[in-house]
């Protein structure tokens, strides 16, 4: 088994899981089959991240724009998420995985919200890897919701405008308490962030890989961490560049 120096492993990796539909189309299969295969890749990614020593793994599961997809595809995606939680929650809990969910919950209906809450509450005391599920998530919406909360605090006299700092914003958005991602990976060869972690990813390393998400394997993940290891992270500075991992 390949090993990384724990001091050199990114604490937080976020993944835009792209390419399920194209994977299915290339094989003459319904798009829903691509999503089902993608769930298998999720299971593997969680195991591999824990094996590597990553502390936080954020997965872009369903964007706030995905509601615009065909109704049958949205329904299948909802069904897959619910099935994943029902089938895998006990195993994840047993493996000391903590689940957190980010995104707008205000308009979620049916049985999906109770399941998301159950996943969080069941694993809240776990101390292993934290898997952050970005569901009904969009970065612009996240910031708008945070700004409304802060504006309400100002209007109520509990907060002065000059107290709205970058730190205050970070503690108000959905990922409060979670470190910013060190590495953001997008599969399928597309090279854009698609409204994902725009605030948190200000200094993240970006890695765009050609593999479609269902083809994302343990070896793919290890190769991504190796590439991260070769990068220099300056965080906007000009002096004393720091390698992503020790030399």
Swiss-Prot record:
Q: Which Gene3D superfamilies match?
A: Decaprenyl diphosphate synthase-like
Note the CDD domains from the entry: Cis_IPPS (cd00475)
GO cellular component terms attached to this protein's record = cytosol
The catalytic activity of this protein is classed by the Enzyme Commission as: 2.5.1.-
The UniProt entry, under Pfam families, shows: Prenyltransf
- Keyword Magnesium among record annotations: yes
Where, by residue number, does substrate bind?
19-23, 31, 35, 63-65, 67, 69, 186, 192-194
Q: Which SUPFAM superfamilies match?
A: Undecaprenyl diphosphate synthase (SSF64005)
Active site, UniProt feature: 18, 66 (proton acceptor)
For the ligand (Mg(2+)), the binding residues are: 18, 205
Entry note: cofactor = Binds 2 magnesium ions per subunit.
Molecular function via GO: ditrans,polycis-undecaprenyl-diphosphate synthase [(2E,6E)-farnesyl-diphosphate specific] activity; magnesium ion binding
Q: Which cofactor does it need?
A: Mg(2+)
Which keywords does UniProt give here? Magnesium, Metal-binding, Transferase
Source organism superkingdom: Bacteria
Single biological process term from Gene Ontology:
polyprenol biosynthetic process
Q: Record's PANTHER family?
A: DEHYDRODOLICHYL DIPHOSPHATE SYNTHASE 2, DEHYDRODOLICHYL DIPHOSPHATE SYNTHASE FAMILY MEMBER
How would you summarize the oligomeric state and partners of this protein? Homodimer.
**Which family does the similarity line name?**
Belongs to the UPP synthase family.
Its biological purpose is as follows: Catalyzes the condensation of isopentenyl diphosphate (IPP) with allylic pyrophosphates generating different type of terpenoids.
Instruction: List the NCBIfam families hit by this protein, alphabetically.
Output: PRK14830.1 (NF011405), PRK14834.1 (NF011408), uppS (TIGR00055)
Q: What is this protein called?
A: Isoprenyl transferase
């Amino acid at each position: 088994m390949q090993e990384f120096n724990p001091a050199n492993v990114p604490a937080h990796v976020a993944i835009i899981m792209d390419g399920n539909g194209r994977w299915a189309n290339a094989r003459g299969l319904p798009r829903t089959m691509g999503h089902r295969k993608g769930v298998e890749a999720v299971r593997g990614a969680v195991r591999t991240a824990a094996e590597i020593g990553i502390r936080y793994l954020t997965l872009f599961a369903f964007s706030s724009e995905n509601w615009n997809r065909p109704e049958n595809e949205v329904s299948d995606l909802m069904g897959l998420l619910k099935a994943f939680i029902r089938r895998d929650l006990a195993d994840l809990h047993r493996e000391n995985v903590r689940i957190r969910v980010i995104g707008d919950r205000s308009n979620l209906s049916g049985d999906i919200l109770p399941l998301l809450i159950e996943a969080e509450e069941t694993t809240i005391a776990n101390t292993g890897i934290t898997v952050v599920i970005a569901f009904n998530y969009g970065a612009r919406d996240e910031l708008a919701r945070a700004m409304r909360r802060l504006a309400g605090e100002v209007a109520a006299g509990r907060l002065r405008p000059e107290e709205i700092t970058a730190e205050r914003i970070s503690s108000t958005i959905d990922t409060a308490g979670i470190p910013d991602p060190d590495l953001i990976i997008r599969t399928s060869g597309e090279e854009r962030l698609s409204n994902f972690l725009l605030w948190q990813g200000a200094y993240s390393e970006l890695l765009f890989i050609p593999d479609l998400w269902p083809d994302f394997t343990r070896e793919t993940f290890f190769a991504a961490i190796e590439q991260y290891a070769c990068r220099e992270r300056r965080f906007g500075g000009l002096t004393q560049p720091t390698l992503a991992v020790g030399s």
